[in-house]
């Protein structure tokens, strides 16, 4: 997936009110960007980091610029726009870049399922195969090359795991897919130190037949693509 038009570069001054960030451009202009990430963004929003942003041609938008990537002062690229996790996963599935999810003839998005009436990110279908339900999570929290999810307690994420367990119990295929959008991450684990309940449910889900996949994106200011399977430790 290439960024078109190309992203523009700035330096982060501060992120505030969760959805806003002030930056300064190379020519000295100060801009306020929309921040499309409700999470803690730990390690992704340090003042002085390089920010790569897009600009909308929608004249009705109050904040036409959107923060897409962080390039940390250590050189790591991080995708902070959480919408990209699903876009990249869909692209990788359709391109059959994810071997575990290849061989299906149909992909549907946002399908209602489960007793708690969630919407699954993707459902794959093929003749003579069980339906495959896929829930996608974006991973940007990193410490010493270790990637973690979540970066804050997530009751919604816990609900999704319960729903996936019910899908697996019905004989369908259930997958939790961690899209790793941080170039410095080399392995993945649930963030037990942040949300112990989520970590416990993830282990239970695996025992009950839910598959756990983690794939890392190659990220640059020019584009991104999910490429590499990472080891998962529960």
UniProtKB/Swiss-Prot annotation:
CDD domains found in the cross-reference section: SfsA-like_bacterial
Keyword DNA-binding: yes
Record keywords, A-Z: DNA-binding
InterPro entries on file: SfsA (IPR005224), SfsA_C (IPR040452), SfsA_N (IPR041465)
Keyword DNA-binding belongs to the record: yes
Residues of the DNA-binding region: 201-220
Pfam families on file: SfsA (PF03749), SfsA_N (PF17746)
Domain of life: Bacteria
MF-aspect GO terms: DNA binding
Leader sequence residues: none
Similarity section: Belongs to the SfsA family.
Function noted in UniProt: Binds to DNA non-specifically. Could be a regulatory factor involved in maltose metabolism.
HAMAP family for the chain: SfsA
The protein's name: Sugar fermentation stimulation protein A
Protein's organism: Shigella flexneri
